[in-house]
Amino acid sequence: MSTLGLLLILLGIIITCTFVILRSVNPIYSILNLIVIYGCYASILLTVEMEFLACIYILVNVGAIAVLFLFIVMMININIVEIQETMKKYNIYMFVGFIGLIGIMGILITNYQIRIKEEVIADFSMFLLNTEITTLQATPSYLDFYELFVETTDLRAMGSNVIYGSQSIWFIMACIILLIGMVGVIYITEDLIIEKRKLNARRRQDINSQVLREYKITIKNYREIK
């Protein structure tokens, strides 16, 4: 199997799992499909010889963010009926997004230029009747920036350009956003736990206080039975 075929299969799996996540109301199934997407992304990085980024992607996303998301969903205890009612409102937006995705894929596909040998173009009639395999070269019209940095490694490029270089501010902002998400989860779950404890305290039966009450003071609305 060629590299292009493998990439197309991985992209197809990613798109399929994305729509499954959007349509699923079970958070466990959503997490499993999300892990499959992360694995496909890591496989794509491995095909372009970025082993370190692929390992970091699996460790960070699958090992941390996916578990954090599952922790949030399980602690908040989202009602599935409410999710189903909410998802019905966004069907039109999902349809529009699907049409937009098809349009973007069409633009990317039509953005390729096909080069044919000059001797084939010179004799067009022979080209139509020729049964032999002719070499057709499809080259993208965009600039491949990976070839400009092919002499360096992904670890060196990430360390010199992303973490400790000109893009370090975005790396720091991503860390702050992740920290805010973790603190927000703790704050939300703490409020829920406190409210649950207060509710249980109000429902608790205190027999001593009930026995010591006077019925004339406690019972206000009554009628005399003759």
Curated annotation (Swiss-Prot):
Instruction: State where it is primarily located.
Output: mitochondrion
An example of a GO molecular function for this protein is: NADH dehydrogenase (ubiquinone) activity
The EC code for this enzyme is 7.1.1.2
- Give the classification, highest ranks: Eukaryota, Amoebozoa, Evosea, Eumycetozoa, Dictyostelia
* Described function: Core subunit of the mitochondrial membrane respiratory chain NADH dehydrogenase (Complex I) that is believed to belong to the minimal assembly required for catalysis. Complex I functions in the transfer of electrons from NADH to the respiratory chain. The immediate electron acceptor for the enzyme is believed to be ubiquinone.
Q: Where in the cell is it found?
A: Mitochondrion membrane
Show the coiled coil region(s). Answer: none
Q: Which gene encodes it?
A: nad6
Q: Which GO terms describe its cellular component?
A: mitochondrial membrane
Q: Which UniProt keywords apply?
A: Electron transport, Membrane, Mitochondrion, NAD, Respiratory chain, Translocase, Transmembrane, Transmembrane helix, Transport, Ubiquinone
Q: Where are the transmembrane segments?
A: 2-22, 28-48, 56-76, 90-110, 169-189
Catalyzed reactions: a ubiquinone + NADH + 5 H(+)(in) = a ubiquinol + NAD(+) + 4 H(+)(out)
Q: Family, per the entry?
A: Belongs to the complex I subunit 6 family.
Output this protein's name. Answer: NADH-ubiquinone oxidoreductase chain 6
